[in-house]
Amino acid sequence: MRPHTRAAAALFAIGYGANQFSSLMVMYREQAHYSAVTVAAFFGVYAAGLVPGLLLGGPASDRWGRRRLLLPALVVSVPASGVLALGGVPAVSEPALYTGRFAFGVVTGIAMAVGTSWVKELSQAPWDPDADAGAGARRAAIALSAGFGAGPLVAGLLAQWAPLPMELPYLVHVVLTLAVVAAVVGVPETRPAGAFRSGLRVHLPRRFRRVVAPMAPWAFGAPALSFAVQPAALGSRLAGFGLVYATLLTTVTLGVGVVVQSWARRLSPVTGSRLGLAALVAGLLVAACAAALGSPVLAVPASAVIGAAYGLMLVAGLLEVQRMAEPAQLGGLTAVYYAVTYVGFVLPVALAALSGVAGYPVLLVGVAVLAGVSLAVVAWTGRVREPVELPAAG
């Protein structure tokens, strides 16, 4: 197995573990009888660990090396899954779920920033001299997205039809991760340890602020809208099938995203961003129609279009970051990019809070309008070729 493939396997494993909880949220509401607010808090505490994991892990790997950060993150994800498996034990269920989700947030943040940078560096000479310039971004995005999709698919199916529904999904992740750890141990280090150039500060080029930042929140906001908001918008139409349906939408969204990412290599980052935002607008309008008609069937193609938008935007953002980042700050800038993408995860919470005022069909149209504004901004600012910016000395 080539070095970049083994590093990408780490991204797959961490994405699998991080997102397996998505399809299990319905189970905790229906079988463990947690309120919707409590289950949302389980989801939110993950973000509380993720952001510091990203913002500290990326720059730290620029200083100490990729393998020294990624391997411990993978190892810690094993007991984190073990703690989540205690969610089925009534006496410790709630604190176990909070603790496990927070731990997963931290290790996912570290692994996403470090693993993406590592895959990029292993997708060039001397490790892979035949790879094209965008191979690193594409490989990292596909591996992460495949993990994000496989985790909830397997977990949802096991929770629906296998024994031990609150334990077995996490055990599968533990076995997978142990195998990946063994594969990653021998991957070459691409970033030798050295002195910090500027502590933990990360230089943000003007193009990042003008082109990448307006698009980035939609990269993860898109799938969140697809498989978190649509089931909620359809409500009673899913009686008895909520877990399976949420798993279906998650799989369609992320599966289409993976397929599109393989094709996105042919596009420039700006074109990918524009097409991604345009697809998101279209997908949200279809989702609004599905919510207005109460049609679970129509929500499936909406998820497919939104998944295509996700795939295009994630790759486009990573390509922009990897082109503009200095080698010494690749991990740090990648971390900032991912941190901004996760801003999009507030959208389901915001729409849930507003649903009593306007209703999901109207809210989804409103979000489509906001995505259209972002499309206009990116289309305008992306026309200008920015001069290369270097961080200030010292």
Outline where the language-model segments fall.
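Conserved MFS/SLC helix-loop-helix module at the cytosolic interface between two early adjacent transmembrane helices
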Residues: 51-93
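Structural signature of the two symmetry-related core transmembrane helices
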Residues: 68-83, 272-287, 369
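Cytoplasmic helix-loop-helix junction between adjacent transmembrane helices
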Residues: 100-144
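Helix-loop-helix hairpin linking two adjacent transmembrane segments in secondary transporters
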Residues: 135-188
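Transmembrane alpha-helices of Major Facilitator/SLC transporters
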Residues: 245-269, 279, 283
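C-terminal transmembrane helical hairpin of 12-TM major facilitator-type secondary transporters
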Residues: 271-317
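A late C-terminal transmembrane helix in Major Facilitator Superfamily
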Residues: 310, 318-368
